[in-house]
């Protein structure tokens, strides 16, 4: 979900023209891509996702995405204003010829920004709650992952109202994460495990921890992918191991790693060879036979791989409490095994 404004013009502006204009008008920006087709930049120390200026046949497209920071939205409005000034041409909302933007700074004001924040949280809460999946979004420097554990950590309910202060704290945390990771090394690779069906989009991306020449490969944080792989390149008899990213927390030494968001982890101490080998052993018990298998979400019906109906329990409307459920399970096992 994003907001897009198109500037219809035949004028050719190099990126440095409007970037310089913004800087001369007091904007302290950091540019991560300074060439078309997509120029990307954000406000120093304040951006989460930054904004994009894309070159199109009809002129320019300025885009800001959901879950952006207040500074991102403000820079979006100022960039639209700058392009209108520099080209002398008209701007339209979402490529709609009937919705002309005449005063972008007034149109995209503080009230509009607040509505964007509220919409971002409402939509992500609903998606996470209904799908049971995490959401990955690209940031100015790195991806960030939203999910139930992250929201719970900031006292943000997936189903009810939430305090705006808690939402602001989460946005501040994501902003700090972007600028922390800007100069850090992650575990990203270009490795993709192809799908048995041959579908390109069904291939699985891999984040990798490696041992080579007696040393653990350098990395500062474990970055999100479909799978985490661990490989000892010094020992050909030890097969590499791959596990779904949702299982990663189960194998990490807690005194060495701390969560960055829902799925990614910052290394805060030394990772030794022994630690990596221990992580590999734990991971082998979690590696699925079929890496491409996706379990059915509770409430979504029959899981063909498990030959099981996966049901959903909502404690908010159930007459059975979690404590009762735990007691019943323990009692059932005690009776069964005795």
Q: PLM features: residue spans?
A:
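Short amphipathic alpha-helical segments
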Residues: 14, 71-79, 322-325, 329
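Aromatic/basic-lined ligand-recognition segments
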Residues: 106-249, 254-257
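Extended non-globular C-terminal regions
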Residues: 189-327, 333-336
């Amino acid at each position: 979900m994003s907001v897009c404004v198109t500037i219809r013009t035949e004028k050719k502006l190099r990126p440095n023209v409007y970037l310089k204009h913004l800087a001369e008008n007091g904007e302290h920006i950091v540019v991560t891509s300074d060439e078309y087709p997509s120029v990307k930049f954000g406000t120093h120390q304040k951006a989460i996702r930054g904004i994009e200026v894309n070159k199109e046949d009809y002129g320019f497209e300025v885009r800001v995405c959901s879950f952006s920071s207040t500074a991102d939205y403000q820079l979006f409005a100022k960039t639209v204003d700058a392009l209108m000034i520099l080209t002398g041409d008209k701007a339209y909302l979402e490529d709609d010829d009937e919705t002309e933007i005449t005063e972008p700074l007034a149109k995209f004001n503080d009230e509009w920004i607040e509505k964007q924040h509220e919409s971002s949280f409402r939509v992500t809460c609903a998606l996470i709650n209904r799908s049971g999946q995490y959401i990955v979004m690209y940031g100015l420097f790195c991806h960030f992952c939203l999910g139930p554990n992250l929201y719970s950590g900031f006292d943000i309910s997936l189903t009810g109202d939430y305090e705006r202060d808690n939402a602001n704290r989460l946005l501040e945390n994501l902003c700090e994460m972007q600028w922390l990771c800007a100069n850090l090394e992650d575990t990203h690779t270009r490795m993709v495990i192809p799908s048995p069906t041959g579908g390109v989009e069904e291939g699985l991306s891999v984040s990798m921890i490696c041992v080579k020449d007696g040393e653990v490969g350098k990395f500062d944080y474990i970055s999100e992918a479909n799978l985490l792989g661990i490989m000892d390149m010094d020992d050909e008899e030890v097969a590499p191991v791959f596990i779904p990213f949702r299982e990663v927390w189960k194998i990490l030494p807690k005194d060495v790693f701390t969560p960055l968001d829902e799925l990614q982890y910052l290394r805060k101490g030394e990772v030794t060879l022994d630690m990596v080998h221990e992580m590999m052993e734990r991971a082998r018990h979690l590696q699925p036979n079929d890496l491409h298998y996706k379990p059915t979400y509770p409430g979504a019906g029959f899981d063909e791989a498990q030959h099981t109906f996966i049901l959903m329990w909502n404690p908010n409307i159930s007459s059975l409490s979690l404590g009762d459920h735990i007691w019943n399970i323990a009692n059932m096992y005690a009776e069964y095994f005795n």
